[in-house]
Amino acid sequence: MFALLSHKLLSRNMQNAKHFVLVHGSCLGAWCWYKLVALLRHAGHRVTALDLGGSGIHSNQIHEVTSIWDYVQPLMEFLGSIPEDEKVILVGHSYGGLPISLAMEMFPQKISVAVFVTAYLPHYTFPPGVLIQEFLKRTSAESLLDCQFTFGQNNPENQLTSVLFGSQYMAAKLYQHCKPEASFLTLPQIKS
């Protein structure tokens, strides 16, 4: 009886199951979603957490990502590969708002909803470059601790081309409220 009831509940959950596509923010990777992936899968949903170009375990190194299109390519390829009649729920965190916005424009028929989790929402008066420039103007160098910034590679305007969060910055600014083991898990995942 219990097995039959469990099967019926699972079947009902599978009928209502959604496909979530999780997009990380700057300097992170698919790994940062590990707790949410487990919760969503436990609830019967399909989950895809992607590493964007030069992030996480993606095969490209950060210096090989020379444009926003290099960065978002894994997301675009994934969305291009799903069946035309399938719709996903896109979830972007922080700078992940930009890739999901681009995906919404390129694949509107494949996206049921997009969720911006404290994420960048593009606007024509505030392109990403302006947002980053304003952040750097208003932020003291000391508060950035051991972050690394690369400027001017492959662009004549000497714009910011890459950011790498340092371990001190992550411990003090990103994971200060987490258990020590959670921040320890992130360190090997940050690319240099």
Language model feature labels by segment:
Residues 1-19, 65, 81-84, 141-156:
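Eukaryotic N-terminal low-complexity, Ser/Thr- and Lys/Arg-rich leader segments
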Residues 22-26, 93-94, 119:
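Glycine-rich His-Gly loop
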Residues 12-60, 77-81, 85-86:
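Conserved HGGG/HGGXW glycine-rich cap/lid loop of the alpha/beta-hydrolase fold
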